[in-house]
Structures are given as structure tokens and as C-alpha cells.
């Protein structure tokens, strides 16, 4: 935005030397010189780019210098090409007044902010009418630029066209706002520039600002609505380069600022804020340049696979607690946070300047709208403001108070007060942190009844949150380098608090009926909000964040004003905040031992209520799509079973009673087909009746009866299960070894992901296997053609029509970026988690063929799978199998477990994937 001096320019490109070489070729070869001229130009371009690439490696954060260097390189080439075209290709001895051209740089090129693969945006300006000469010169120049490999955005206009189109189109107006003269007729450019300011800009300032801000808001919404998405768009994302450019455009439009430095003279930024502006801009420009260098294309998305490479290129080193890529991304998010803060300050100053102008000149000149006072603060226009510049310095506790009052009264924070809070946040020392009044105010804010999420986000933006709670400051802008978490830790935490507030107000009753009901039964709502705040507080410290976080909770809770019982409960919740989701998603909830072990840890209804609520908001806050009806179903089943055990001290019904009750429910569900229960019910073992819900059992019995009536050896049925948010796939076949892994392979080949599997064998030797299946983005299959494809793929797999494993290996990963992560497979055996089965948990890189391979490895080692529970955490899968040996007994022999473990590790390894993939 400022035009930095490009050092050692001739090492990038020596225009005079290049022009002389082109001139000599033109003199020697005449009309046939074009190939030779193009070769010389291309060599100059490649040499210049090589020089700038090396400079970027030598000074990896010099974003301004590198982008200005690329613009300088293009400038010189354009000038040489223009001179060559007008001197040798289309010379005119006595040009008329119409035979004039000015070449202008617009867009990023006009700002002298060009990344290595940026488009070259050029405007050709000519007088009132286009002559053949103007058209010939324009066309010849464009062909040279295209042949050099540039992607050119071009326009050809008269000053009259420019004025008319700029009035009508915001994009054109913005492009011309930053147009820069490159070569040609300077007088023509000056004339057009003068007309632009007098005929386009004057009187449209407020309209331009409003349209630019609306454009920005729409862009933010497209890009994810937050600056803390862990794969940000460096250019278009919130807090990115486009936001900085928007500030510059507005400042230039209103104040005719020629560079970002002049925003200080206009009173829109302080010197300190301007330096923050430049630092953030330079860093983001550098990141964009590295992206272009790595990819060889105009890439602006900072995806996981590029983050590691750029962290290395920009010389971020690993530290004991954080990897290099996490340190790089934390610095990135701190810069975009600074951009957000600058945006607020800038727009507040702009708004104030407009307001002063209206007051001086408008119909209401001399009229002062009424403000009111609230505990010493000024409230005006729905905003709360500090009444003076020393307000926070006189009493730093007010730095917390202003946010609490805003939350309690439904007010916004005046941006000028945000600026003061940002400046004065350094006043928060131990004396303020340990002040009982400050902590009571903070707790009131955290547990606010209106919108604590927004107020806490403002507090975080101003730097006050991290200063008052230093442990929270440690996770500020900290990313989690995985594909599961969508946001930085601080943003995830604030979102979790927001979801908790919504649940308490009943706004999420449909998705979270139990949490909505139970939150009003807890003894201390403060515990719920403090636990949400602290559940991830110790991430990034190099150890188990649950254990370390519980220790932090034991220190912080008394400071916040919680009593001993509340402190103990918060510490336990932080320690066990993953217990409920892990149990629900990785364990068989129909196994009594699962409930027994869970209840032994939870111990009380109060703990259960709080844990269920915390689990729900934690999953919701991970990111869009992480909460679904299937997870809700699992958590609900676990909650209900644990609640019954805790309330009664035991399960309400013993095994035989539960089976009898289930049969009665199935009889009712079958209705007119109840006779089928008598016909086939005795063939189904007790384990089947306990494991399956009555609606699934009734479907299974009808399907089994039809298959037997028509003597069908294989029956496959798929249907959408709305309650579980998945597709129920039932396979009934003569039981034989290897059936499970073949069915799994068929489902995956049809594009499905298995999220749960229950494998049963009737007393007469038929397999009844139920699978819950979703598509790669967590949605059920519901269309007839999709269901038919799954059924056909399973039939083909069971019939062994074609080699299954190579086909699966060729299927692309649903998320190819998974290769950016180091996921080492791990296999755990647990003979205590179930009374009847050995539980095997496999953690590995998620891929389409994984479950099929694991199932085959178990089959080849004579292991019988009774149920499987599949959970995906971004790039990582956790597959849990309840198994026995061929006799139906647990697997307890150490050497046998070692053999099975190695087979599973081999099946899940990247090396095995590489063997199967085509060369």
C-alpha cells in the first residue's frame, strides 16, 4: 500500500540493458525479430523471478520488498514491450491527438503488491475515440505478455468510459482508485485521474464506505465467518490481506491518502497502530509469496499441507511445547487478530469524522443526541464507552467491568474504548488478577444471561482476557494441527461458552433435549460455565491437557470465587471432559460392563449432568458438522443408561427381563406381522435382543422371513434411518468367515463410511449384520440410486467379483490433506472393558480401505468380530472391535495378542497403502 523502495533493482532486471538488447534485435532482424525478442524478454523474466525467489529465501518475512520487487519486474517488462511495439512494430511519425496511450497498473499490480503468480491487471487508456493504431499497440502488447506466461486482466477505455463505468460499478471504481501510471502518455493519465476524483469520488464517500463494508461482510461469510479457521485464506479470509486493503481503499477514497502511512495524518490510526498495520501486512504478503512459490500457482489457501512447508521456509523452530508449524500458525492468527482490532479502530474513527461533519453541516447542526450514564460509563447509540482517556488507568478493574456491563445490558463496546482497553491491558498485573471485585465481575460476565460469547470475544480481541487469565492467554491464537478441530483453542473455547448459553436459554432444545432439561437441575450453573472455559486451557503444554488442565482449574477456581465443592467438580470435569464422548463412540453401549465402568468413574447424578452438558458444547464448538444426530443418539443412550444406574443403584432390569421387555416392544412394532416373532424369535440369541433397538429388530425379522420364504441365500436391504442420521444397511447371509471384512469393503467401494456395526449369528447359522453408514461428509444416503449402489457393491464383494483390496486402495482419500499429518498406527487390547469380549482399539490414519483391511487381518488371525464402532477425528480414525476367538472366548494369550497386534499395525500402515496404490 506504500510503494517501498526496491533495493538492488538491476539485479532483478536492468531495463536499459534489456531495452538495448531488444533494440539491437529489432534493428538486425526487422519484422522477423519477434521470436528472438520474446526469448530475451523471457530470459529477463526468469532471471528476475529467480532473484526474487532467492531474496524470499534469504529474507523470508520481507513481504513488502518481495511483492514490490515483482511489480517492479513487470513494470520494466511492460515499458520495454511498449517502447518496442510503438517504435518498431507500429511506429507513427506524426501522431494525432487521438493516437495516444497510457498504460496503467491496477489491482494488486497497481498497489505494487504482486506475489510470484499474481495476475497482471492492466488498463490501457486512450483519448476520446479508439484509433486503429491504439488497437494495434494494445493487441501487440497483450500478445507479448500472454506469450511470457502472464495471466493478464485487461481493459481498454477512454476517460469518458472510465468515469461512466466507475460510477456504475464498485469493482471498477476500486480498481481505478489504486491505478498507477506505468508508461506512455502521462498527460492522458493525469487528465483521467483528475476527472476520477472530481466526477466519480466527490459526494459518494459514504456510499463507497457502506458498499465496501457490505462487500467485506459478504466475503467474511463465504470464508467461514471467523478469522480463526485453521485453514485460512490469506487473501480473502477474515483478518487477511483484503481486509487491510479495504481500510486503505476507504482511507484513500475519503482522505486521498497515497499510502498507508497517510492514514496516521488523517487521524484514523496512531503511529503504533500503523506499525502494527505494516507488520501484519508484511507478514501476510510474505506468507502469500511462499504459497505461490511452493505451489507454482496463485494459491491463497493456507491448507495443512502447506503450513509445515511455510513454517520451515519462514524459519519457525520447534520448541519443547509447540511444533514449528503450531508456532507459525499462532503468529499468523495473532497478526489477523491485530488486523481485526485495527479495522474496528479505523471504522470508529471514520464514523466519528462523518458524525462531526454531519453535526456541522446537517439539518441537526447544534443538536446533541442524548446519552446516559451507567455506573460512570457513557451509553450512547447502543454503545458503552469509557468517559475519559484515563478511565482504565485510574482503576484497571474497569477493564473487566466494561465488558461485563456490555453483556448484562445488551450493549456494544464503543470502538474507541476498545482501543483504550487494548492500550491499557498492560495495566493488568497480579494485583488486579487477585482482586476479589475483579474476579466477581469476571465470573458475572462468564455466566452472563444475555450473550457472554460475544462479550468474551470482544474482551479477547482487546487483549484483556489473556492478561486477566494468563492461562487463557497461552492458548490465544493457538491452532491445533489436525483436521478435526476447525478453530484455534481460544475461539473453540469461546464458542463452547456460547453454545452453553444457548442451551441454557432453550435455543438448542431440538438438538440437545437432555442438556436443555438437565442444565436447569444442576446445583451450580457457575460450574458449567467455568468448566467450559477451562476444559482445554492446558493445550499446547506438551503433556496430557486434561490432567494439566485439572491442575489449572484447582488454582483458578478459588480465585474466581468458587467454593471447595465447585472447585472439585470443575477440576473433575476438566480431567474427564473426554470420557463421555470416548465411551459413547468407542464402546458397545449394550454391554453392561461399559455402563458399569462409566458409572464407576462418574459416581453422581450431578457429575453426570455436568459432563453431558460439557460434552455436548465441546463437540458442537469443534466446528460445523461435528455434531450430528448419530452422536446425539449415542450420548443420549449412554446418559439414559448411566442415569438409571446412578438413580436406582443398579440396572432397572436384569438380562432376562430386558430380553422379555424387548420382545414385547418388538411384538407391538410388528403389528399385524407379530406372528413372525413366534416363528423366528427363538433363533435369535439374547445378545442380539440386548444389542439392537426394537425398530431395527422388527425390520430384521421381516427381512429374514422374506429371505427364507424365497430361499434367498443373500439378502441386502438399505434404508434411511432419520433418528440416527445415517443409513441402516442390513445383510442377511449364510454365516462364514470373512463376511465382515467383505461387507465393509463393499460399503466403502460404494462411497460409504461405516460408523457402527453389529454382527450377529442366529442359532441356525445365519448372519444378521447391521451397519450404520454415512457419506464422506457425515450425511446419510437417502436416494434410491445411492442405496441400490451400496446393495450391489456389497453383493459383488461377498461374491468375490473382482479384487477388493486393490480397488479400495485406488479410491482417493476423502480428505487428501491427511498426508500432511504424521499419524502412527497404534493397537490397544483391553480384556477388562467387557465381561464377554476382548476389546481391540486401533488408531490409525483414516482412509477408505482401513476398516476392510483391519477386518481382513482379524479374519486371517481367526478372530471373530461381534461388533465394531468407528469414529473419525479428521485425519485420524479410531476403530474399536469387540471380538472373541473361534470358540467364543476372550483372547488372553500374550503371544497371540502380539501376533494380532502386528497384523493390525501392518494393515493400517502407510507402507501397506503404498504397496497397494498403483505406481
UniProtKB/Swiss-Prot annotation:
Residues 728-811, 839-919 form the ACT domain. Has four distinct domains: an N-terminal nucleotidyltransferase (NT) domain responsible for UTase activity, a central HD domain that encodes UR activity, and two C-terminal ACT domains that seem to have a role in glutamine sensing. InterPro entries: ACT-like_dom_sf (IPR045865), ACT_dom (IPR002912), GlnD_Uridyltrans_N (IPR005105), HD/PDEase_dom (IPR003607), HD_domain (IPR006674), NT_sf (IPR043519), PII_UdlTrfase/GS_AdlTrfase (IPR013546), UTase/UR (IPR010043). It catalyses: [protein-PII]-L-tyrosine + UTP = [protein-PII]-uridylyl-L-tyrosine + diphosphate; [protein-PII]-uridylyl-L-tyrosine + H2O = [protein-PII]-L-tyrosine + UMP + H(+). The keyword Nucleotide-binding does not apply. Its cofactor is Mg(2+). GO terms for biological process: regulation of nitrogen utilization. One of its GO terms (molecular function) is phosphoric diester hydrolase activity. Uridylyltransferase (UTase) activity is inhibited by glutamine, while glutamine activates uridylyl-removing (UR) activity. This is Bifunctional uridylyltransferase/uridylyl-removing enzyme. Its EC number is 2.7.7.59, 3.1.4.-. Belongs to the GlnD family. The lineage of its organism: Bacteria, Pseudomonadati, Pseudomonadota, Alphaproteobacteria, Sphingomonadales. Residues 489-611 form the HD domain. Residues 1-373 are annotated as: Uridylyltransferase. It comes from the Bacteria. Keywords: Hydrolase, Magnesium, Multifunctional enzyme, Nucleotidyltransferase, Repeat, Transferase. Gene3D superfamilies: 3.30.70.260, Beta Polymerase, domain 2, cca-adding enzyme, domain 2. Modifies, by uridylylation and deuridylylation, the PII regulatory proteins (GlnB and homologs), in response to the nitrogen status of the cell that GlnD senses through the glutamine level. Under low glutamine levels, catalyzes the conversion of the PII proteins and UTP to PII-UMP and PPi, while under higher glutamine levels, GlnD hydrolyzes PII-UMP to PII and UMP (deuridylylation). Thus, controls uridylylation state and activity of the PII proteins, and plays an important role in the regulation of nitrogen assimilation and metabolism.
Amino acid at each position: 500500500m506504500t510503494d517501498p523502495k526496491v533495493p538492488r533493482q538491476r539485479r532483478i532486471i536492468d531495463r536499459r540493458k534489456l531495452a538495448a538488447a531488444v533494440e539491437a534485435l529489432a534493428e538486425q532482424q526487422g519484422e522477423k525479430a519477434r521470436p528472438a525478442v520474446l526469448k530475451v524478454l523471457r530470459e529477463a523474466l526468469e532471471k528476475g523471478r529467480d532473484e526474487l525467489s532467492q531474496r524470499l529465501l534469504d529474507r523470508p518475512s520481507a513481504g513488502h520488498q518481495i511483492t514490490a520487487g515483482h511489480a517492479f519486474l513487470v513494470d520494466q517488462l511492460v515499458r520495454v514491450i511498449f517502447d518496442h511495439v510503438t517504435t518498431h512494430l507500429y511506429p507513427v511519425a506524426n501522431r494525432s491527438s487521438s493516437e495516444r496511450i497510457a498504460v496503467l497498473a491496477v489491482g494488486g499490480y497497481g498497489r505494487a503488491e504482486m506475489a510470484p503468480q499474481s495476475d497482471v491487471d492492466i488498463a490501457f487508456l486512450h483519448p476520446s475515440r479508439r484509433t486503429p493504431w491504439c488497437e494495434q499497440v494494445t493487441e501487440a502488447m497483450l500478445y507479448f505478455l500472454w506469450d511470457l506466461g502472464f495471466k493478464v486482466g485487461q481493459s481498454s477505455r477512454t476517460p469518458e468510459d472510465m468515469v461512466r463505468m466507475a460510477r456504475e460499478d464498485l469493482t471498477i471504481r476500486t480498481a481505478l482508485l489504486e491505478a498507477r501510471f506505468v508508461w506512455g502518455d502521462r498527460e492522458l493519465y493525469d487528465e483521467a485521474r483528475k476527472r476520477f476524483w472530481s466526477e466519480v469520488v466527490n459526494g459518494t464517500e459514504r456510499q463507497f464506505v457502506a458498499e465496501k463494508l457490505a462487500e467485506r461482510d459478504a466475503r467474511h461469510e463465504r470464508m467461514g465467518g471467523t478469522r480463526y479457521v485453521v485453514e485460512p485464506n490469506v487473501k480473502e479470509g477474515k483478518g487477511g490481506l483484503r481486509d487491510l486493503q479495504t481500510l486503505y481503499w476507504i482511507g484513500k477514497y475519503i482522505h486521498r491518502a497515497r499510502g498507508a502511512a497517510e492514514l496516521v495524518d488523517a487521524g484514523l490510526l496512531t503511529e503504533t497502530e500503523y506499525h502494527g498495520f505494516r507488520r501484519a501486512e508484511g507478514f501476510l504478503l510474505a506468507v502469500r509469496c511462499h504459497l505461490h512459490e511452493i505451489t507454482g500457482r496463485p494459491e491463497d489457501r493456507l491448507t495443512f499441507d502447506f503450513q509445515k512447508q511455510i513454517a520451515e521456509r519462514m524459519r519457525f523452530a520447534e520448541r519443547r511445547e509447540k511444533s514449528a508449524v503450531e508456532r507459525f500458525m499462532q503468529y499468523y492468527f495473532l497478526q489477523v487478530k491485530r488486523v481485526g482490532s485495527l479495522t474496528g479502530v479505523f471504522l470508529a474513527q471514520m464514523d466519528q469524522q462523518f458524525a462531526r461533519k454531519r453535526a456541522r453541516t446537517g439539518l441537526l447542526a447544534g443538536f446533541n443526541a442524548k446519552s446516559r450514564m451507567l455506573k460512570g460509563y457513557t451509553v450512547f447509540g447502543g454503545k458503552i464507552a469509557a468517559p475519559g482517556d484515563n478511565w482504565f488507568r485510574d482503576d484497571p478493574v474497569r477493564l473487566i467491568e466494561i465488558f461485563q456491563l456490555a453483556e448484562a445490558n445488551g450493549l456494544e463496546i464503543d470502538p474507541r474504548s476498545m482501543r483504550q482497553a487494548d492500550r491499557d491491558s498492560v495495566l493488568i498485573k497480579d494485583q488486579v488478577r487477585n482482586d476479589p471485585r475483579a474476579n466477581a465481575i469476571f465470573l458475572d460476565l462468564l455466566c452472563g444471561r444475555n450473550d457472554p460469547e460475544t462479550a468474551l470475544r470482544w474482551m479477547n480481541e482487546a487483549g484483556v482476557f489473556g492478561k486477566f487469565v494468563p492461562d487463557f492467554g497461552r492458548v490465544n491464537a493457538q491452532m491445533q494441527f489436525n483436521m478435526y478441530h476447525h478453530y484455534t483453542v481460544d475461539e473453540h473455547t469461546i464458542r463452547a461458552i456460547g453454545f452453553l448459553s444457548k442451551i441454557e436459554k432453550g435455543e438448542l432444545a431440538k438438538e440437545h433435549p437432555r442438556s436443555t432439561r438437565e442444565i436447569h437441575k444442576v446445583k451450580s450453573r457457575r460450574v458449567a460455565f467455568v468448566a467450559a472455559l477451562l476444559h482445554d486451557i492446558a493445550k499446547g503444554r506438551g503433556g496430557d491437557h486434561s490432567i494439566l488442565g485439572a491442575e489449572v482449574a484447582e488454582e483458578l477456581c478459588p480465585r474466581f470465587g468458587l467454593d471447595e465443592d465447585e472447585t472439585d467438580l470443575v477440576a473433575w470435569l476438566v480431567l474427564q471432559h473426554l470420557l463421555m464422548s470416548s465411551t459413547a463412540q468407542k464402546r458397545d453401549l449394550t454391554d453392561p460392563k461399559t455402563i458399569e465402568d462409566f458409572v464407576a468413574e462418574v459416581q453422581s447424578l450431578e457429575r453426570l449432568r455436568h459432563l453431558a452438558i460439557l460434552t455436548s458444547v465441546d463437540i458442537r464448538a469443534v466446528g460445523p458438522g461435528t455434531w450430528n444426530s448419530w452422536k446425539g443418539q449415542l450420548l443420549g443412550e449412554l446418559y439414559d443408561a448411566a442415569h438409571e444406574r446412578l438413580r436406582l443403584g443398579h440396572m432397572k432390569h436384569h438380562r432376562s427381563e430386558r430380553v422379555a421387555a424387548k420382545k414385547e416392544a418388538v411384538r407391538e412394532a410388528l403389528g399385524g406381522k407379530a406372528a413372525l416373532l413366534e416363528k423366528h424369535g427363538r433363533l435369535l440369541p439374547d445378545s442380539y435382543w440386548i444389542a439392537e433397538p426394537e425398530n431395527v429388530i422388527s425390520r430384521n425379522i421381516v427381512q429374514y422371513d422374506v429371505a427364507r420364504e424365497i430361499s434367498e441365500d443373500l439378502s441386502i436391504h438399505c434404508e434411511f434411518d432419520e433418528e440416527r442420521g445415517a443409513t441402516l444397511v442390513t445383510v442377511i447371509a449364510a454365516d462364514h468367515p470373512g463376511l465382515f471384512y467383505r461387507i465393509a469393503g463393499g460399503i466403502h467401494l460404494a462411497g460409504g463410511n461405516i460408523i457402527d456395526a453389529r454382527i450377529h449369528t442366529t442359532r441356525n447359522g445365519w448372519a444378521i449384520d447391521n451397519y450404520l453408514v454415512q457419506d464422506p461428509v457425515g450425511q446419510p444416503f437417502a436416494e434410491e440410486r445411492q442405496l441400490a449402489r451400496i446393495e450391489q457393491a456389497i453383493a459383488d464383494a461377498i461374491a468375490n467379483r473382482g479384487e477388493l483390496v486393490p480397488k479400495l486402495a485406488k479410491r482417493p482419500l476423502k480428505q487428501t490433506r491427511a498426508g500432511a499429518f504424521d499419524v502412527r498406527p497404534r493397537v490397544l487390547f483391553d480384556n477388562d472393558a467387557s465381561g464377554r469380549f476382548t476389546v481391540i482399539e486401533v488408531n490409525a490414519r483414516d482412509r477408505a480401505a482401513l476398516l476392510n483391511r483391519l477386518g481382513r487381518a482379524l479374519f486371517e488371525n481367526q478372530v471373530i468380530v461381534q461388533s465394531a464402532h468407528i469414529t473419525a477425528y479428521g485425519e485420524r480414525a479410531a476403530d474399536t472391535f469387540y471380538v472373541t476367538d473361534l470358540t467364543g472366548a476372550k483372547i488372553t494369550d500374550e503371544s497371540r495378542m502380539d501376533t494380532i497386534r502386528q497384523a493390525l499395525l501392518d494393515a493400517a500402515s502407510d507402507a501397506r497403502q503404498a504397496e497397494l496404490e498403483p505406481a
